[in-house]
Amino acid sequence: LSPVLDTLPPQDMQALRCAELDSRLLVSVLGNLQPVDLLRSAEGRLRAVIAALPHQGVLLASTALWVHVGGPPPETLEVCLPGGRRSRLPYLETRRGRLPRSDTTVINGVTCATIARAAVDIARLGPPVAAVRAIMIARDHGISRVRLLLTLNHCRGAASRGCPRAQHIIEEVMSGAPPRAVAPPENDADG
């Protein structure tokens, strides 16, 4: 026996189907069932989307935020492609242009928008609830108001669409309650 470290082939998945266990053990990521326990790390979440990632694609927005922090998987794969290539694949949403190096990070050889850039892009272009939630997630993961505003300042030209909205969301969310801890506080033995 050997552990499952990647997506199982369809024939193995078909043989292992059990309606009661599927919802506990598997989650659909871009239409492919993935074992939940493999999605507990950024590397595992990246592995779940890498097969669908176009060559030289940079993960953006909700996809990048999901890779970094987890949560419900994205319904589409959002990527930035050099040269403005487009895709007709229903699960792939492409954007033209390049991100500044300061707005990207590399995870297992794949370039991905930082938490700050992903949150800013969602705040600029996403639905209102998702926009506020993205900034709250960034705040809860230690991203400061200054970092978010500096990242927003990198959005120039066509990428400046939605910047006033994003700035307003950042100001409102970051001026509110103090950041919540990502991990629950440790029990204090003294009291």
List PLM regions with ranges.
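Short gly/ser-rich loop at a beta-strand->alpha-helix junction or flexible surface loop bordering the NTP-binding
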Residues: 1-191
